[in-house]
Amino acid sequence: MKIHPTQSSALNNEHDKASRSELARRIARLGEAKFVDHDISIDQQLLGGQPDTLFIPTGTIDLSTARKLGIQTESQIYGGVVPFPFVGSKIITHSAFGDDPPIPAGWHHELGLALAPHVLSGWSAFTLDAVRAAALDMLGRTAIRLKEVEATAGLGQFVATSVKELDEAMAQLDEPAISKHGVVIEENLDDVVTYSVGTTRLFGEAISYWGTQRLTTNNSGATVYGGSTLHVVRGSLERLASLGLADELQQGIDKAIAYDAIVSRIYPDLLASRRNYDVAAGVTSYGECRIGVLEQSWRAGGASGAEIAAFEALARDPGRSAVTCMSMEIYGEVDAAPNGSIIYYSGVDPVAGPMTKYVMELE
């Protein structure tokens, strides 16, 4: 078996590449496989895909690419295959506002309606006019958050509580990117806890987990993703849901399971061995408590290192049923990882600056 992380123009900073390579090495070791570095060309991959090859793409891949790579089942990928590229993005979480004409081919209007009970209030839009109209529709009821679809790690988001702030936020949006990928307009929450709820299947084994995300400040002063702590059990999301956890957490798990089932029903060609959902719980600007799924991740992500550490711990002890693992991203410091941790990156990234990324088993 060989591991091929596929190439992408996104997530291509030095620390991203190093993290993907370390992740692939550890997955290869877990499956007693050969690791092939991410510098392999896509042409070589298209010629060399075999049933025993496991692909680790940077993002979700579409059906056409999956067929060229020989991917037919989720056991051949750590990540996901989607019928249309937009299905792998946060844009599917909400209905399109109005009769927005640039809605992409393959868009199902019933999806947003079906997901509505399980997500925050919001809209998706594909033109500046639609973004503004949707935002004005919501501003009378709540503060809003604009989210660029292609942005990751908490970047590309703007909060507006007034028309003036909306205009300032919209001035930062890229119109060609809106036409291509869309923008999410969503109610903004304060006092937010962001949960990670997910399941991953690798080499015939399955884990599921709930966890919390932490935020940090990057070297440019922006608030970004800083890591996750995952509480992992063997088995499916349904097994996780049966544990009788605290009410808010249970709601989050149930909503993630519903989101997963609805998208899988409407897009039956979806394949995903990694199904991770961000769930936010917080308070609206009018004091209402809200909880809902923000987005899906069917690709290698920030919490992937913690997931693989959990697989490793459970493989070492077949009688063990649960484990807690943590991923951490620290900006401004090199060699900040504690003893006993698994280092994914430690150095000075030419773009992101000095940083350390590591994973630890906690208990």
Predicted feature descriptions by range:
Residues T6-N13, I56-I61, D99, N188:
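Structural motif
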Residues F35-L139:
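Conserved N-proximal alpha/beta basic substrate-recognition cap immediately N-terminal to
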Residues T93-V183, R201-E205, T217, T229-A261:
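Active-site nucleotide/adenylate-binding loops and adjacent lid/helix of ATP-dependent enzymes
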Residues D167-S228, N276-V293, S297, G301:
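Phosphate-binding site of ATP-dependent enzymes
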Residues A222-C289, R316, R320, T324-V359:
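A long amphipathic alpha-helix within ATP-dependent nucleotide-binding catalytic cores
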Residues E150-A151, N188-V192, D269-R274:
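A short catalytic or substrate-binding loop motif that flags glycine-/basic-rich loops and adjacent residues
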Residues M1-D39, W107-E110:
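Short, charged N-terminal beta->alpha structural module
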Residues S304-D317:
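A short alpha/beta connector and helix-capping loop motif
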